[in-house]
């Protein structure tokens, strides 16, 4: 045993604590206990792979970087000793230099030991705790970045509509928007132009229905890119052009003599809607012609 003076108090420590070698079994066990109490564990579960040790100058890493000449000389000694672990070569060097180490001045051992060293190591079941080492930090960062990758995959699935649960609200919203647009358009055009549906030529009505069916079919396809290109729907002709077309057909029936009679069942509806289309009572009412009867007379 040797006396250590520090802070006005005399403390004793085993000589083998620094040398690593004791005179008997008791000193070796005491030195081992002293070294164990100076380990600051940074990882849980009893793993000291990245732990640090408590020294007179604070915490220090167990890994030591050597210069090139020192590393070459050290590995030559390790090869000559025939050991496979560098720590065994270090232990041999410490034992060989025991006399020179005893001649060195003693250290102040009044430094405080870490609280984790005095408490027993946690059980192996607590491996979920995060280590403060660089390797553990990199693994934690990789785990933290995992949701971003999943978020990118979910966004790709949303674009291709492979996620059925996520695409249903989108399709319902698109169908509701299309129904609202169709209802608003029909309500806007029904009041002033109630006779347009009955008085429209068949080829014009067929083209308008075909255009509306194409729009609905495009929305039912379900892809975001196609819907984005087809929304808003193509503009419809203004309502002011329909009376002009109807007046042209009514004013010059001889020009459409080749067309069949297409207003046979709409006399009552056209007559009821005609007063709403006239202004100041000066416009001509919509006249219906039966071209076959006219040819007979």
From Swiss-Prot:
One of its GO terms (cellular component) is nucleus. Residues 282-297 have a biased composition (Basic and acidic residues). Residues 1-22, 116-136, 273-297 are annotated as: Disordered. Residues 46-104 form the TCP domain. It is found in: Nucleus. One of its GO terms (biological process) is regulation of secondary shoot formation. Pfam families: TCP (PF03634). Keywords: Activator, Developmental protein, DNA-binding, Nucleus, Transcription, Transcription regulation. Transcription activator. Binds the promoter core sequence 5'-GGNCC-3'. Forms homodimers and heterodimers. This is Transcription factor PCF8. It comes from Oryza sativa subsp. indica. The lineage of its organism: Eukaryota, Viridiplantae, Streptophyta, Embryophyta, Tracheophyta.
């Amino acid at each position: 045993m040797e006396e250590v003076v520090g802070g006005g108090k005399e403390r004793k420590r085993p000589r083998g604590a620094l040398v690593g070698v004791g005179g008997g079994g008791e000193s070796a066990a005491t030195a081992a206990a002293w070294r164990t109490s100076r380990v600051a564990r940074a990882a849980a579960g009893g793993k000291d792979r990245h732990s640090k040790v408590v020294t007179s100058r604070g915490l220090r890493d167990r890994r030591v970087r050597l210069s090139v000449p020192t590393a070459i000389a050290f590995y030559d000694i390790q090869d000559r000793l025939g050991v496979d672990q560098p720590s065994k070569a270090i232990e041999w060097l410490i034992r060989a230099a025991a006399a020179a180490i005893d001649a060195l001045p003693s250290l102040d051992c009044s430094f405080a030991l870490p609280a984790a060293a005095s408490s027993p190591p946690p059980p192996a079941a607590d491996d979920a705790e995060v280590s403060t080492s660089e390797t553990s930090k990199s693994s934690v960062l990789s785990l933290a970045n995992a949701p971003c990758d999943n978020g990118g995959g979910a966004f790709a699935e949303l674009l291709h509509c492979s996620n059925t649960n996520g695409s249903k609200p989108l399709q319902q919203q698109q169908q509701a928007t299309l129904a609202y647009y169709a209802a608003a358009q029909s309500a806007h055009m029904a009041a002033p132009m109630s006779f347009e549906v009955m008085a429209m030529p068949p080829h014009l009505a067929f083209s308008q229905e075909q255009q509306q069916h194409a729009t609905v079919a495009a929305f039912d396809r379900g892809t975001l890119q196609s819907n984005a290109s087809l929304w808003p729907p193509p503009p419809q002709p203004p309502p002011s052009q329909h009376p002009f077309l109807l007046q042209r057909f009514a004013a010059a029936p001889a020009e459409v003599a080749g067309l069949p009679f297409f207003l046979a069942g709409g006399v009552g509806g056209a007559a009821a809607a005609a007063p709403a289309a006239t202004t100041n009572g000066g416009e001509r009412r919509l006249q219906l012609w039966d071209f076959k009867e006219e040819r007979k007379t």
